[in-house]
Amino acid sequence: MEQPPSTSTGIGDVGQNEPITAVFLLNIDRHTGPLLAGWVESGNRIGAIVVPGFRRRPTSFSVGNVRRRLQRKRLLKRYLGNSEVRLIEFGKPYDWDALRRQLSGIDADVLISYAFPILLPQDVLAGFRKGGLNLHPALLPNYRGPHPVHRLVVDGQHAVHGGVTLHRMSAGYDEGDILAQVAFSEADWVSRQSLAHSTATAFSMLVSGAVPAYCRGAVSGMPQPAGEFIWAELEPAHMIVLPTMPIEHVARLWRLLGTVPGIYLSMAGGNVRLGFQIRRLGPPTGQAPIRRWARVEFDLADGRVVHWKYSRLLKRLAKVRGLLAPARVAEPHLEMRLFGRSE
């Protein structure tokens, strides 16, 4: 997959027939790989990809870091073919001056970010003609913050505020003008696989469609309304299963949060981490939870159930089960909504 040649765009909007050069600030994974491919396939250029630096920087040779770099190369090969892409590792402690120097030779129109944990300095964003854009996995202004997907599932609001927003980056967390959104339905949340597929599809739609429209002046965006909105930060209490919860809600918690970060049941002696449900026994009994070897039996709002207790063995079994009988992932029927379209 060849990238088009670089073209100087001048100040302001990008010309209709000129490719757009973007710097991406994101990890390369199953969510972001398709958007990178879609960006290049639509005739645009990748100036550089700024990827997270490794959490630990060993003083000697690290097999783990070599493995992670090889995995990153395989993903780039899978999604971008033989395209030459510049990778910049950027991690704590964040040296913004050093990053500016590395980006100074790239004539980029826009910065596109996903899941970067801190605010970018305004002078960094000012280095791009069209500033910085961020992909947020919820329908803003609802569920701003670092853990929107987790909180949407915990709060049972996934079918109401679930989706992806493309917004301008500003001096506040997730507060910039909204350029475009893709809403999810209940069907997009039936499994981790379906959510990942829908998210990747939405990312690709927004980056391939809304970003060029914004850079060429066809979309200006809409300011976010003022008001009090839920700050999406996951607390330990959000991972506790309560007897007032319906069985289906707990099943969804397990499907989407069970392996990371986990869900727990409070029992005498401490919290027990839950695995997936084995069976439903019948209506609630009013009895306390019972621990039986690798299982735990407890009441929920609409029935008494038995779950496996979470363990390393269960984690492996769940992975094998997913490989042998993967969840069916239907092609999502998603629509993109643009804000502030020019006439």
Predicted features and spans:
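Conserved nucleotide-sugar phosphate-binding/catalytic loop shared by glycosyltransferases and other
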Residues: 64-91, 312-313
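Internal anion-binding site segments
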Residues: 223-343
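Structural motif corresponding to alpha-helix initiation and N-cap regions
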Residues: 33, 73, 93-100, 146
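Structural motif
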Residues: 25-29, 92, 311
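Hydrophobic N-terminal alpha-helices or hydrophobic patches in metabolic proteins across all domains
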Residues: 13-15, 26-35, 40, 107-110, ...
